[in-house]
Amino acid sequence: MIELQGLSQRFPGASGDVHALRDVSLSIAAGEVFGIIGRSGAGKSTLVRAINLLNRPSSGRVIVAGQELTALDTGALRLARREIGMIFQHFNLLSSRTVYENVALPLELAGKPKAEIAATVLPLLDLVGLSALKGRYPAQISGGQKQRVGIARALASKPKVLLSDEATSALDPETTRSILELLKQINRDLGLTIVMITHQMEVIKQVCDRVAVLEAGRVVETGRVIDVFLRPQHDVTRAMIGDVISQELPASVLKRVESRLGNGRDHVYRLAFTGEGVDQPVLAQAIRRYGLDFNILHGHIDEIQGQAFGSLAIMATGELADVKAAMEYLQAQGVVVEEFEHVV
């Protein structure tokens, strides 16, 4: 559905060009929810605005639904953009227009007749749960409701792609969850391809199928969300996952175990489980098989896209050869094993 090939973006700066994007290539499949995450200044918003050419890249190709947008003239690009909806952190509603009229605006600008506008807008208001508020003005509704208006407006032209640029970052956690559930429903019901730009790994965890991690204008990691959580490859990814699932031992636990390390018999590991592995007694089996003692130091169980995900920090006590054999056994059972390097 979306192909980004070698995108680079340079902006003039006081001391030379600023490189906002550096040779970014991504492939996003039709019907998936794809997340792009990074810290502030990583280039996320520049990248999402390159998809609909609100920012034209300095070099590279943008292909959406088989059409190369970077090769289109102004008129053809205007038509192509109708198939790409967009929602923003700030809702950009017109204060003088009602909820209904805000959603109808792009159809009015396209010259659609009133009957066709009504046939499109009313079902959209029902979809986003705002039918009862269609006559209200933006000042009379909440932030979450304003974002629902923005979503309905973005869907009015029946796009194939929806771009979401930090659409939940100004909302409280409960409202964020409701908006993410709405986007998941839209993805399921309409088969819409959604690209989520965010700095919040919690958003990625809740709604995305795959994710790309952006740092200093480059894609440093990409993959299925569950795989990225299980096996983060880049320091930036590990840090951002740590925002929602702690990857480090708490200081109180670290202090307690430090005195036992270095004796050759005690080793600290992080174990990550997913899917059916969360429910299997693999630790008990490893203890019996290799005659070890396992002390659980820290643990966390969560859910990613409906799939159970567990993380444990353990101290394994026994002969080094037996400990290593036990870790290899756990890996063979699908457990991700990582030794805490800063502890041992």
From Swiss-Prot:
Assigned EC number: 7.4.2.11
Q: Which UniProt keywords apply?
A: Amino-acid transport, ATP-binding, Cell inner membrane, Cell membrane, Membrane, Nucleotide-binding, Translocase, Transport
SMART domains assigned = AAA, NIL
Q: What is its main location?
A: membrane
Name where it's found. Cell inner membrane
User: Mind telling me which Pfam families this protein's record contains?
Assistant: ABC_tran, NIL
Domain ABC transporter residue range list: 2-241
Q: Topology in the membrane?
A: Peripheral membrane protein
Q: Which domain of life is it from?
A: Bacteria
Coiled-coil intervals in this record?
Answer: none
Q: Which reaction does it catalyse?
A: L-methionine(out) + ATP + H2O = L-methionine(in) + ADP + phosphate + H(+); D-methionine(out) + ATP + H2O = D-methionine(in) + ADP + phosphate + H(+)
A GO CC annotation recorded here is:
plasma membrane
Question: Which GO molecular function annotations are given, in alphabetical order?
Answer: ABC-type D-methionine transporter activity; ATP binding; ATP hydrolysis activity
Q: Which residues bind ATP?
A: 38-45
Per its UniProt entry, what is the enzyme's top EC class, as one word? translocase
The text of the family note is:
Belongs to the ABC transporter superfamily. Methionine importer (TC 3.A.1.24) family.
Q: How does it assemble?
A: The complex is composed of two ATP-binding proteins (MetN), two transmembrane proteins (MetI) and a solute-binding protein (MetQ).
- Functional note: Part of the ABC transporter complex MetNIQ involved in methionine import. Responsible for energy coupling to the transport system.
Q: What is this protein called?
A: Methionine import ATP-binding protein MetN
Which organism does this record belong to?
A: Cupriavidus necator (strain ATCC 17699 / DSM 428 / KCTC 22496 / NCIMB 10442 / H16 / Stanier 337) (Ralstonia eutropha)
Q: What is the lineage of its organism?
A: Bacteria, Pseudomonadati, Pseudomonadota, Betaproteobacteria, Burkholderiales
